Amino acid sequence: MAKFNRIHLVVMDSVGIGAAPDANNFVNAGVPDGASDTLGHISKTVGLTVPNMAKIGLGNIERPVPLKTVPQEANPSGYYTKLEEVSLGKDTMTGHWEIMGLNITEPFDTFWNGFPEEILTQIEEFSGRKVIREANKPYSGTAVIDDFGPRQMETGELIIYTSADPVLQIAAHEEVIPLEELYRICEYARSITLDRPALLGRIIARPYVGEPGNFTRTANRHDYAVSPFEPTVLDKLNEAGIDTYSVGKINDIFNGAGINHDMGHNQSNNHGVDNLVKALKDENFKHGFSFTNLVDFDALYGHRRNPHGYRDCLEEFDARIPEIIENMREDDLLMITADHGNDPTYAGTDHTREYIPLLIFGKSLSGHGHIPVGHFADISATVAENFGVDKAMIGESFLDKLV
């Protein structure tokens, strides 16, 4: 019998808690990640007031230097630790896949200087459309259409851009490049990015409408992902007939594998929490696992190196935690974690190789305190043991520590 009837995992995208032991093997603008510390530097440079996470034990997590503005709790309300990544990557897909039990020994490719000419030329030859070379770099999805949408409306050229993650995105005005044509081009791009030197996690169709100065992206986005190369704990739960709910981009990250209830994309972190609360309240969701990704920390503030905005975003999420807890049942378990770091005070604009925090709360738990430092996949091993399914490739359960 399951110790917890429902487990809810919330990933605060990019909220790292200090450089990982191998951080110097990863770089940002030529600077090794060894001094990165997302939460530590936010707390130190702009202050951080997150009383609800602090109450569970955020400030108590073992660190070389305590978080400056997050107090340590003498009597925390939950369990806490930090987890180390073993996979060879610091991107979203790698982090989430490892959390669900996989060891990624061959990282996806990212293109900080844009995609190679060979890929762009192949897409041009297939589509019969030119590619706007100036857009070929990591770009904000709204900024790229503001900057190049007017030109696309005049010329019909393709807007191809990337991000910190291993993705190729194609933006197209629906009245200039019809959806069916955009999807066909994306399917072709998917077919040529399945191996090195361009092994990409996702190809994303990004249609938009409107006039210059007033463009808006539409709901006709489509992701062409790759499925995890081995079964994850999500697959094992699904095969056992256990409910698996996804909130935000979780469904995209896993290409739908192992997910039987998708709550859809989030318009914002707050919208994501709204969707999680809907899942918590779902009368039909009696037994199973929910998996939520909140991406604003990363997309809006980490990559843009905006510590003030990042702090505000953390505080906004923290203020929603009581609502999440209020809607939990007595036999629910909440786990709050991250997938990598993205220190907004650091060099460059890329993710940072860091430990991730793990906060655990349940209304039925009488104990509290520190759990030994472990690895990302320990989360899924714990979920697997709770629901009586096999774990995936890696991970050690800490279920027996939760009393």
Swiss-Prot record:
Gene3D superfamilies assigned: Alkaline Phosphatase, subunit A, Phosphopentomutase
Co-factor remark: Binds 2 manganese ions.
CDD domains documented for this protein: PPM (cd16009)
Pathway the protein takes part in: Carbohydrate degradation; 2-deoxy-D-ribose 1-phosphate degradation; D-glyceraldehyde 3-phosphate and acetaldehyde from 2-deoxy-alpha-D-ribose 1-phosphate: step 1/2
Keyword Ion transport: no
Cellular component annotations (GO), alphabetically ordered: cytosol
Residues the record lists as binding Mn(2+) 1: 13, 339-340
GO molecular function: magnesium ion binding; manganese ion binding; phosphopentomutase activity
Catalytic activity annotation: 2-deoxy-alpha-D-ribose 1-phosphate = 2-deoxy-D-ribose 5-phosphate; alpha-D-ribose 1-phosphate = D-ribose 5-phosphate
Top-level EC class as recorded in UniProt: isomerase
Alphabetized UniProt keyword annotations: Cytoplasm, Isomerase, Manganese, Metal-binding
Cofactor(s) named in the record: Mn(2+)
Subcellular location, record wording: Cytoplasm
InterPro entries: Alkaline_phosphatase_core_sf (IPR017850), DeoB (IPR010045), Metalloenzyme (IPR006124), Phosphopentomutase_DeoB_cap_sf (IPR024052)
GO BP: any one term: nucleotide metabolic process
EC number: 5.4.2.7
Family: Belongs to the phosphopentomutase family.
UniProt-listed PANTHER family: PHOSPHOPENTOMUTASE
Function: Isomerase that catalyzes the conversion of deoxy-ribose 1-phosphate (dRib-1-P) and ribose 1-phosphate (Rib-1-P) to deoxy-ribose 5-phosphate (dRib-5-P) and ribose 5-phosphate (Rib-5-P), respectively.
The name this protein goes by in its record: Phosphopentomutase
UniProt organism field: Streptococcus gordonii (strain Challis / ATCC 35105 / BCRC 15272 / CH1 / DL1 / V288)
Taxonomic lineage from the root: Bacteria, Bacillati, Bacillota, Bacilli, Lactobacillales
